[in-house]
Amino acid sequence: MSIPVMQLKHELALKAREEYLRKELPLKVRANTSRMNPGAKTWIPQINHRKSRNHYNRKETCQFPPLYNVEAKINHSYSAFYRPFTKRENGLWYANPYYMQHGPNGNYHHVYY
């Protein structure tokens, strides 16, 4: 007595589905282009160019050295006072009054770097 074709199909489908679920799929990366900046990859953080409105998204090419620069820390090649914000021990960020006086713009607070 032969097994009905539909039952065979069903079993095959179940087996295929089990195999598919058992298989480890590679992590899916986000699409590598964005609609607003087609040349840039999406996992590179986008640059916000409206600097006068947004102090928190700045270009990576800043005039002052990056935070937590290990080599600079080792060589002591820069002063911490040339940063607009500092991270205190409690984990909060404070504006740096020293930077306001001695930063790239001197006393001109309305000029963004």
UniProtKB/Swiss-Prot annotation:
Keywords: Meiosis, Mitochondrion, Transit peptide. The keyword Nucleotidyltransferase does not apply. One of its GO terms (biological process) is meiotic cell cycle. One of its GO terms (cellular component) is mitochondrion. It is found in: Mitochondrion. Its main location: mitochondrion. This is Meiotically up-regulated gene 98 protein, mitochondrial. It comes from Schizosaccharomyces pombe (strain 972 / ATCC 24843). The lineage of its organism: Eukaryota, Fungi, Dikarya, Ascomycota, Taphrinomycotina.
